[in-house]
């Protein structure tokens, strides 16, 4: 079958299609038969590269291009007030509740994730990084491990031979322990909901072409919006099978997009959170001193804003957003004084500029997305 390995193959671009019940619209928009349905509104389209190495200049709508997400800082999560939550008559220990973890995986062998009888708290684990038979997985890539398989591995002398899923960074394990780790009277530690069960998704890294599009250094980890949306879909599917209430937790975030909640993942999560028995928890508030954002009122006159870029930086991406129907233009000046000239926004378009002395190539894209106008700037070092 031509689409059998599309999700896990680097020979395909990935896009997020939005439709209203008629899936043929997505197939026609992206000229592909390779589609994975998320729900009645969103689907993932896999488009054969056919020799193309980048999506630059392909004129795909902004919201169809998956955003990249990174891991959020964990240093402020130690003091979460577990005792205060437990006080009075609430008795909140997570009994009967599932928590869906979307992160870097989990150390399933850790004793913090086993009940008193030795059984695992993990009801299902989808490792997107381990290639398996596409026909054996719910969403066509990765490998799924059931609670029975995990418990069989835990009884083995070599668990990793039976369930070879690891959390290399420890980020997902840390967060899972904080949320659902067992009480330890000797150390005084307890997860927030130690009796809760877990559904775990280990995200795969974003494909190289997508990291290149956002100027992300290959040595850094990033995760694609498509894989995150499918992770949410998977968690929903398992929770529905088990007939349990579910808390979907994402320890990841991004600076991209308008922050108005109009992106595909934003809207998908908002829709899930409206359902009875479903809650969504995301990270926030980790970048107060990082100066990653700037806002202001643009007057009729020019306004100068300086962007500091580190020496020998691999590249960077920056987005400018303004409310439609207002229009604005940008004029970018390099440290040596070379200017792009006025670049006026519009419905959609692109400009390519090379700063010779800085050995930098600048790509300026502009779109109109919903009720906002948007300019996306990407800069890369040239040889």
Task: Cite the ranges covered by each PLM segment.
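Autoinhibitory propeptides
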Residues: 2-98, 105-121
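Short acidic, glycine-rich surface-loop motifs adjacent to enzyme active sites
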Residues: 232-260, 283
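Conserved small/polar residues in nucleotide/adenosyl-binding loops
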Residues: 375-382
